[in-house]
């Protein structure tokens, strides 16, 4: 360690939820809750306005028998901890915003109400606890960090009220992270400086609006834009034509050509423009560089009549389609970043297979699931949610599972959740019971704690167990927030085994190719929220769970409907955070499976309107998508199609003074035979 940092290590430091025994709430205003809003000013171009209101702060004093008896913890709803190791842990607000291309970012502090709080006068003579580094799930924390210089200076820490971090371009949106610091701390005077009713302007200078609009016209897609719609004020919203067929690119080894035929036909039938590149073709090649160049060329300059790709599927194991070798893990991320900023510009996945026998089950399970040809779909109303064993981190594992069940996986949403919390009761036999539930059929599996590349640590569920599963025709999405379960450069990791299994296993698998972290995994699923056993919902800080559901009044624009969206949506929750390991999460987390596959939890939520003649006013609604085939609207009737997701049209005729109204939260995909005859009309809302 460089001694110039003046950071001292104290051995065997463990932060546990039980360390703090007393708490004091200090009211700061008459408000009942904190507010942190970023809005666009309609009358001022290139300016956003930030408004911060603090209702109270909470001080938690340490159990005097603990090693941490010299410290107190400061918290406030919606404010989050930092990871500046050794410096005072003064929580901050953090939010993602949209920025115009080429713009530089500056700030104007318009005003605030200042309040000084003397902690000693409130009975707190201890220092505020120092921030600690993010902890990997593969390590045992045994060091305590304190920056002696930071604690010996007679000045307010966090004096910079606002900071900006440029993240990059996510397909059609340039995003950045704004960090607001309304609380400052002087460790010598033992005082807090509160900046309440804080008002700030974020000013964009040198914005290239024409370039921004061009980017949106070319690349804007609701599936991507919607992921950030919840927390990004849209400075420019250029409407692209919604009559567009989505481009789906497959990169495969030639030996899989005949096996892929039904999958390609299936995707084409759903309305995708499918492009297939084989690695023996000169413009594709077998190296990471050549494949990346091939994909980037399609993204930058798609063939005539094609939109830039939205989905990309790699078909083959690393011997067929190599992955990028990072210092400590493999990553497919860089196949899908076309702007050089480490953010993906398409949704992506991999069918990992070395031979046809490994590939065919993945194709068959995907087509069956997407076509809803299972004889019994009721299993989709079941979920397995597992908090794995770690006796010092139950606040993370149980907190994540509790959030999932309290908010979403419950009877209010017609879901039966099989939950496994820690500690495991005597004779509960979690491991056997979990496998039994999966055999009976579940639509969603989520595990958080420790893994190896071979599977879950405790409760045990390993690669060798997958061969004994019996969940034929009852496949679901498995999401694993743990280390190495998707370490796909080895012969066969847990995620690959789950996907390759014939007539059993998973239809999609999300997991990491390296060691994950406690805070970041929690945020990936729950959102950027304070870790607790029962975290509350926060509309400003959405995680993967929130983005799959809509029971808290979220706009449909922010839902994650597909497996590829969920992967990106979870990583965006980490991107919003104060973590220093955001790039690791983009690199490590992978989807084994079809990125375009819609996630079905509980009700299928897909409306099929087929072989119908509409002679009276009719409305068809769906909370995901509508498939329309061979429909005639006549006799002056109005047919209204309302979908949260996409509308797919294969054969529609509107005649005899009739009307068709299309209201899609996603895209309207005209696949074939769209005929609106003279005297009739159609409308897009």
Model-derived features: positions:
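Bacterial Sec-dependent N-terminal signal peptides
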Residues: 1-24
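Catalytic-core segments of thiol-dependent peptidases
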Residues: 296-328, 389-390, 396-492
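Catalytic cores of nucleophile-dependent amide-cleaving enzymes
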Residues: 337-371, 453-540
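Extracellular beta-helix/beta-solenoid repeat scaffolds
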Residues: 131, 136-138, 147-148, 607-685
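Extracellular pro-sequences of secreted precursors
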Residues: 21-280, 287-311
